[in-house]
Swiss-Prot record:
Name of the protein in its database record: Phosphoglucosamine mutase
Top-level division of the source organism's lineage: Bacteria
One Gene Ontology CC term in the entry: cytosol
GO terms for MF: magnesium ion binding; phosphoglucosamine mutase activity; phosphomannomutase activity
Protein's organism: Corynebacterium jeikeium (strain K411)
CDD domains: GlmM (cd05802)
Catalytic activity: alpha-D-glucosamine 1-phosphate = D-glucosamine 6-phosphate
Gene Ontology biological process terms in this record: carbohydrate metabolic process; peptidoglycan biosynthetic process; UDP-N-acetylglucosamine biosynthetic process
Length: 447
């Protein structure tokens, strides 16, 4: 068995790579590993399990839940719900673990499984390694009689508990703000529009009718052009786009311009510093964040700490350094006072609260930073592990960095979830970024 866990749990084509038997084994192994790390004190251990609405979700939820129950864990099934809600409910219910069945922004045929430890935090790499090892040595039998775990339906008030929680994060009513929210026909479809309405916004919800098959189908945060058009059509103050599991948020201003995760973080960092809420005046971002954001933060007296890609690594740095804000260009934003993972709904609420507080349009708030032109090319490869050390790639990177000097940067890295190698170039003008990225991508493709 090859390595299962990527940067965001286990992910793959449902019923091909990610099968029901595999989900059952994962559930059983995770139950054994995570429960062994918690002081359950003789009580029955519990796990919160949620999913997005794609067609394979019910199958995988049933299989994973059966695996957990086979090891004596009571499963609290919270139904279709955002990933950050599962993280919150894991803590709110006092559960020993949480699990989200979702492939996030991936197409409908894919699915994934991501785990949360007690308290709602994503697992560390060493714990994931232990789960994989445990899968290879699972016993044939498990607890019997009353010691077998139960699968309990806890979906009736799960969403309401989450909405009540995120609603406490803002102090400014959103009255008068008209927002179009693209729910990607995913887990945000009920949660995000309702959260924004409860806060006072005038909400136009689009792509909010999941039917098991239409999640991420030409909509949501990976198809932002759909939202750009809708914002102009509805004459809205802004638009917010979520992905399939609602852990990310991208925005569009009233003029139809995209406001990405870097810009959202810059807006929130300046706001939190102004309000005395930005611990150590420091923001956590990843190596993929735009150089323009880092320059803007420096100009505003805010330090930027960098991590590798993945909101789990952003969170790890937030915890290790006792910081309050971090995230990714893709729209995963973590506000550590209120969340343990990226939360698209919370991000949208907080962004609109800043608009309400200042009375400024999103376009003006976003001008806090100048986005350096960036080109990202995803190159399909046969073996991600050999690219970075290939002599041709090393030489091409050195030449590109020499050409750019201090006016840009180059970053090559493997995808954590797909057989791709990502080539990213930032430069002073779009043409230069495209030209250099194209050359690098061609070299990578030849390896």
């Amino acid at each position: 068995m090859g390595k299962l866990f990527g940067t965001d749990g286990v992910r793959g084509l449902a019923n091909k790579k990610l099968t029901a038997p595999l989900a059952m084994k994962l559930g059983a192994a995770a139950a054994r590993v995570l429960v062994s790390k918690e002081e359950v004190g003789g009580r029955r251990p519990t796990a919160v399990v949620g999913r997005d609405p794609r067609v394979s979700g019910e199958m995988l939820t049933a299989a994973l839940s059966a695996g957990m129950a086979s090891q004596g864990v009571d499963v609290l099934d919270v139904g279709v719900i955002p990933t950050p809600a599962v993280a919150f409910l894991t803590d709110d219910f006092g559960a020993d673990m949480g699990v989200m069945i979702s492939a996030s922004h991936n197409p409908m045929p894919d699915n994934g499984i991501k785990f949360f430890a007690a308290g709602g935090r994503k697992l560390q790499d060493d714990v994931e390694d232990e789960i994989e090892a445990t899968m290879l040595e699972l016993p044939e039998t498990g607890p019997t009689g009353a010691a077998i775990g139960r699968i309990l339906d806890e979906s009736s008030d799960a969403l309401e508990r989450y909405l009540a929680h995120v609603g406490t994060a803002i102090n400014h009513p959103l009255d008068g703000i008209r927002v179009v929210v693209d729910c990607a026909n995913g887990a945000a479809s009920t949660a995000a529009p309702e959260a924004y309405r409860q806060a006072g916004a005038d909400v136009v919800a689009i792509h909010s009718r999941p039917n098991s098959f239409n999640i991420n189908d030409g909509v949501g945060s990976t198809h932002i052009e759909v939202l750009q058009k809708a914002v102009l059509e509805h004459q809205a103050d802004l638009g917010l786009a979520h992905d399939g599991d609602a852990d990310r948020c991208l925005a569009v201003d009233s003029e139809g311009n995209v406001v990405d995760g870097d810009q959202i973080m810059a807006i929130l960092a300046v706001a939190m510093k102004e309000n005395g809420e930005l611990k150590q005046n420091t923001l956590v971002a990843t190596v993929m964040s735009n150089l323009g954001m880092k320059l803007a933060m420096r100009a505003n007296g805010i330090k930027v700490l960098e991590t590798q890609v993945g909101d789990r690594y952003v969170l790890a740095e937030l915890l290790a350094s006792d910081l309050s804000l971090g995230g990714e260009q893709s729209g995963h934003v973590i506000i550590s006072e209120h969340a343990t993972t990226g939360d698209g709904t919370l991000t949208g609420l907080t962004l609109m609260a800043r608009m309400a507080q200042t009375g400024k349009p999103l376009s003006e708030l976003a001008s806090v930073m100048t986005v350096l032109p960036q080109t990202l090319i995803n190159v399909p490869v046969a073996d991600k592990s050999v690219i970075a050390d290939d002599e041709r790639v090393v030489e091409a990177i050195a030449k590109a960095e020499e050409d750019l000097g201090d006016a840009g940067r180059v970053l090559l890295r493997p995808s954590g979830t797909e057989e791709l190698f990502r080539v990213m170039v930032e430069a002073a003008d779009p043409g230069t970024a495209r030209r250099i990225a194209g050359k690098l991508a061609a070299v990578v493709a030849e390896v």
